[in-house]
């Protein structure tokens, strides 16, 4: 039965205590507004995975206020579709400032 109930959440900007939070230096994870998934995701129903193309974090062309590699920005992230747990990730650009958003996953 589909109820619309939220099953899980994956933070593309890792929160305190989450894997990758330390790549957002000087607590920039707290005030960086976005590292969204605005393009098409892909799914592998046989494996039960979903693939997220995560965009450049705000502000696209200036990264001085968000030091560090900024994981999971500008990455392909593979999640378990049932649990939302990260299976693997590949960060295409570390600390992106050129708006090289992945077009799809």
Question: What is each PLM-predicted segment?
Answer:
Residues 1-31, 65-102:
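Extracytoplasmic/lumenal domain signature
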Residues 34-39:
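Short alpha-helical segments and helix-capping/turn motifs at coil-helix boundaries
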Residues 46-48:
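Short coil/turn segments that connect the beta-strands within blades of beta-propeller domains
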Residues 51-52, 88:
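Short beta-strand segments at enzyme active-site cores
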Residues 52-70:
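Short, conserved, GDST-rich strand-edge loop motifs in beta-rich repeat architectures
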């Amino acid at each position: 039965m589909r109820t619309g109930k939220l099953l899980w959440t994956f933070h593309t900007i890792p929160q305190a205590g989450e894997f990758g939070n330390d790549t957002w230096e000087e607590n920039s994870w707290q005030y960086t507004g976005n590292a969204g998934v605005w393009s098409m995701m892909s799914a592998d129903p046989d494996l039960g995975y979903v693939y997220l193309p995560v965009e450049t974090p705000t502000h696209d062309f200036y990264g001085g206020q968000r030091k560090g590699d900024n994981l999971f920005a500008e990455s392909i992230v593979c999640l378990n579709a049932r649990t939302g747990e990260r299976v693997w990730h590949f960060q295409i650009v570390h600390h992106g400032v050129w708006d090289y958003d992945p077009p799809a996953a």
